[in-house]
C-alpha cells in the first residue's frame, strides 16, 4: 500500500522553516539567510520513499505586511491551508510566544485541520525553558502533537518524519520519485542569486531586491549553461551597494551564486549579472507579477 499527503510548514519569519525543508530533502531547494522574510513564494519539497510520499509546502513567514509584496507573501502562506491535510506550525525555542504567533493560531483554529507544533532551535535553550514554551503554546491551542527539533543539527527530525508518515493515508504517488520540487530551474537560479545578495548586503537592501533570470541556455561551444540574471532594486543608492567599489560586490555575489547553481544543475555555468533600478516595485502589482510574485499562486 502506498501512502501520501500534503503538509504545510507555517510560522513567523526566520523560525527555520526553510532550514527544516532543506534538511529533510538532503539538498538546498529553499534559500536561507538571517534576514526576515527571506522566503517570498511557496516552495514545494517532495519527500519520496518506496512506500510513501510527503509533499511539503514551505511558506513565506507570516508578518504584518507593509507593502503589496508583503500582502502577497502573507496571502500565499495562508492559502496553503486549503491545500493540505496537516500543518507544521513552527516556532523558535529561544523566543517567547508573541502577537504574531497568536495571529497565526487564530487562523489555524479556523482552518480546522490537524496542527503539529514544531518547536525549532532546541539546541539554543535549556530543557526547562523548552517545557515552559510547550505549556505556553498548549494553553492557546489543542495541538495534535508537539515535536521539539533542531532543523540545523537534525535533532529529532527523523521522529517528526516518522510521525507524519505514520499518519499518512493511502493515496497516489503525485510526483515521480526523482522529483524534489515543483519549481522550474529558472526560479531556483533566481533564488540562489537573491540569497547571495541577502548574505552580502546590509540595512535596507535585502527587502528591496528581486532577481529575474532573463535567459538560460547551453552554449554548445563551451558546454556551459549561460545564464543572464538581472538584480532589481528600488533606489540608485541600493544599486551602488550591490555593484560595490569597481564592481567588487557584484563579482562576489556572482561567484558565490555560480557555485550553488553548478551544484544544483550538475553543469558548468557562466553567470552574467546586471543591476537595474525599478522604483517602488514592491508596491506595484504589475512589477510584482513580472518578477514572479503572482496572485495565481494563491
From Swiss-Prot:
One of its GO terms (molecular function) is ribosomal small subunit binding. Residues 11-18 are annotated as: G1. It is found in: Cytoplasm; Cell membrane. Residues 37-41 are annotated as: G2. CDD domains: Era (cd04163), KH-II_Era (cd22534). Residues 58-61 are annotated as: G3. Residues 201-279 form the KH type-2 domain. Gene3D superfamilies: 3.30.300.20, P-loop containing nucleotide triphosphate hydrolases (3.40.50.300). InterPro entries: G_ERA_dom (IPR030388), GTP-bd (IPR006073), GTPase_Era-like (IPR005662), KH_dom-like_a/b (IPR015946), KH_dom_type_2 (IPR004044), KH_sf_prok-type (IPR009019), P-loop_NTPase (IPR027417), Small_GTP-bd (IPR005225). Residues 149-151 are annotated as: G5. It is a peripheral membrane protein. PROSITE patterns: G_ERA, KH_TYPE_2. GTP binds at residues 11-18, 58-62, 120-123. Residues 3-170 form the Era-type G domain. Keywords: Cell membrane, Cytoplasm, GTP-binding, Membrane, Nucleotide-binding, Ribosome biogenesis, RNA-binding, rRNA-binding. Its main location: cytoplasm. GO terms for biological process: ribosomal small subunit assembly. Belongs to the TRAFAC class TrmE-Era-EngA-EngB-Septin-like GTPase superfamily. Era GTPase family. HAMAP family: GTPase_Era (MF_00367). An essential GTPase that binds both GDP and GTP, with rapid nucleotide exchange. Plays a role in 16S rRNA processing and 30S ribosomal subunit biogenesis and possibly also in cell cycle regulation and energy metabolism. This is GTPase Era. The gene is era.
Amino acid at each position: 500500500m502506498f501512502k501520501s499527503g500534503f503538509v504545510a510548514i507555517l510560522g513567523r519569519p526566520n523560525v527555520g522553516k526553510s532550514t527544516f525543508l532543506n534538511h529533510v530533502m538532503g539538498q538546498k531547494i529553499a534559500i536561507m539567510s538571517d534576514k526576515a522574510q527571506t522566503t517570498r513564494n511557496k516552495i514545494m519539497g517532495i519527500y519520496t520513499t518506496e512506500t510513501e510520499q510527503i509533499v511539503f509546502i514551505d511558506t513565506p513567514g507570516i508578518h504584518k505586511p507593509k507593502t503589496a509584496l508583503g500582502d502577497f507573501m502573507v496571502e500565499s502562506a495562508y492559502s496553503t491551508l486549503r491545500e493540505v491535510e496537516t500543518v507544521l506550525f513552527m516556532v523558535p525555542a529561544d523566543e517567547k510566544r508573541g502577537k504574531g504567533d497568536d495571529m497565526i493560531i487564530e487562523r489555524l483554529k479556523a482552518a480546522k485541520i490537524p496542527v503539529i507544533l514544531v518547536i525549532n532551535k532546541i539546541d539554543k535553550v535549556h530543557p526547562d525553558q523548552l517545557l515552559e514554551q510547550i505549556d505556553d503554546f498548549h494553553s492557546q491551542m489543542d495541538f495534535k502533537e508537539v515535536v521539539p527539533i533542531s532543523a540545523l543539527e537534525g535533532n529529532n527530525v527523523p521522529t517528526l518524519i516518522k510521525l507524519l508518515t505514520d499518519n499518512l493515508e493511502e493515496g497516489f504517488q503525485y510526483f515521480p520519485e526523482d522529483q524534489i520540487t515543483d519549481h522550474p530551474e529558472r526560479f531556483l537560479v533566481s533564488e540562489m542569486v537573491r540569497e547571495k545578495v541577502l548574505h552580502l548586503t546590509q540595512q535596507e537592501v535585502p527587502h528591496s531586491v528581486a532577481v529575474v533570470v532573463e535567459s538560460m541556455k547551453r552554449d554548445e561551444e563551451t558546454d556551459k549553461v549561460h545564464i543572464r540574471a538581472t538584480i532589481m532594486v528600488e533606489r540608485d543608492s541600493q544599486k551602488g551597494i550591490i555593484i560595490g567599489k569597481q564592481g567588487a560586490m557584484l563579482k562576489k555575489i556572482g561567484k558565490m551564486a555560480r557555485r550553488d547553481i553548478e551544484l544544483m544543475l550538475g553543469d558548468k555555468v557562466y553567470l552574467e549579472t546586471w543591476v537595474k533600478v525599478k522604483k517602488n516595485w514592491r508596491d506595484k502589482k504589475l512589477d510584482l507579477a513580472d518578477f514572479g510574485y503572482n496572485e495565481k499562486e494563491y
